[in-house]
């Protein structure tokens, strides 16, 4: 029952943000949108503080990185291949395009900020522990605020009804199915983690600031750490895929980008794939951003 109460809180905050958009005072809306880009880093600092105690209790903490990296590789490739097969069956042909190294560098620098935030949080936790004081920040309450801000942001996303055709919906479908297939493959190499937990971890779609906290609350801190690192790695792989093969297989690259397609990797979609594929990225990113907290929470509660 507690699990469903936590899921309900997430959905209520997301829905409140969506419904209250354009109804809040203008100054408060402006403040919310100014805070949103930096709120992720605040969350990551808080997550690192919370997970620092977990790392001390784990005999081989490098296993977290190994398992997360393997799962991220398999789910990213799974999403790419699954989307490719779906569109290949419809007779779609590869595209042509290009991407600049400057855009790739800028995207990777933005990803590095996330790792810096994690390192800062871990450093603060270790420093305070050295002075005999234990830092504690409620990551769950921060996540609820973040979900409200995400709801506001989604309400202002420029989605056009003409974009909602069944071909575009195959992009997020490919991500969902491919991620599940990737979890099955990972299960063969990582028998120490139950298959149902790997499937749950695979459904974060790169939404790292949410999955780590939700999985920690509903399962345990060990799986929460894997969830966080898995989705961080997925975001990195999304950028790499978009650069290497996004210009040739845009729909598949967008699918592997998961929830990041409507924010972090969107500039690369625009340049590498062209404006024709912006609707694919926006619709897929929107759907997966909404589904991620719901699916992960439900699977974690089972």
Language-model segments: what does each one mean?
Residues 3-14, 57-82, 110, 114, ...:
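Entry/N-cap segments of selected transmembrane alpha helices
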Residues 1-23, 30, 42:
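N-terminal signal-anchor module of multipass membrane proteins
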Residues 48, 53, 197-237, 249-283:
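Alpha-helical membrane segments and immediately flanking helix-loop junctions
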Residues 18-22, 26, 67-97, 170-215, ...:
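Transmembrane alpha-helices that form the ion-translocation and gating core
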Residues 13-21, 36-61, 120-125, 139-162, ...:
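Hydrophobic transmembrane alpha-helices of secondary-active transporters
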Residues 2-15, 36-37, 67-78, 133-147, ...:
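Structural signature of hydrophobic alpha-helical transmembrane segments
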Residues 293-302:
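Juxtamembrane boundary at the C-terminal end of a transmembrane helix
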Residues 4, 25-36, 52-69, 89-107, ...:
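Interfacial helix-loop-helix linkers and transmembrane-helix boundary segments
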